């Protein structure tokens, strides 16, 4: 079964600047930061009819993370290691949300994992 991309993050040192940039360049509707400092990007901006959700947040280094829906994040991390990748973030239960993890491919590109 093909695993769909279900979420993305765009992070950097100045999330206010990032919010404004993406609002302007793509016309995205982006919420103001929630108590966790995360601004959610509204659905329906393209792609599948339901859209792909996203967030703007503070990160030490700028990066975009695409999240792929998987059945078991821990099992997927183990598979990534077996294929030459590495763990970036162990599985973590987001308060009131899903279990997420991050891996890097053999070239170092970070991919997020979210439990289906």
Task: Report each predicted region and the residues it spans.
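N-terminal beta-strand motif that seeds the catalytic metal site of vicinal oxygen chelate
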Residues: 1-19, 64-66, 115-116
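Short coil/loop residues immediately preceding or within conserved phosphate-binding loops
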Residues: 5, 51, 98
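Vicinal oxygen chelate
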Residues: 10, 77-78, 83-116
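Short alpha-helical
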Residues: 16-17, 74-75, 98
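Conserved short beta-strand elements that form part of the metal-binding/catalytic scaffold
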Residues: 28-62, 110-115
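Mid-chain, well-packed structural core segment of small domains
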Residues: 59-87
């Amino acid at each position: 079964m093909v695993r769909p991309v279900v979420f993305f993050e765009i992070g950097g040192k100045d999330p206010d600047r990032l919010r404004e940039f993406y609002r302007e360049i793509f016309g995205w509707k982006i919420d103001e930061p929630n108590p966790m400092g995360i601004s959610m990007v509204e659905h329906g901006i393209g792609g599948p009819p339901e859209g792909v959700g996203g967030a703007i947040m503070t990160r030490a280094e700028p990066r975009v993370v695409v999240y792929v829906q998987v059945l078991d994040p821990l099992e997927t991390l183990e598979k990534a290691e077996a294929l030459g990748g590495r763990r970036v973030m162990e599985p973590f239960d987001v308060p009131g949300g899903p279990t997420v993890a991050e891996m890097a491919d053999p070239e170092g590109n970070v991919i997020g994992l979210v439990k289906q």
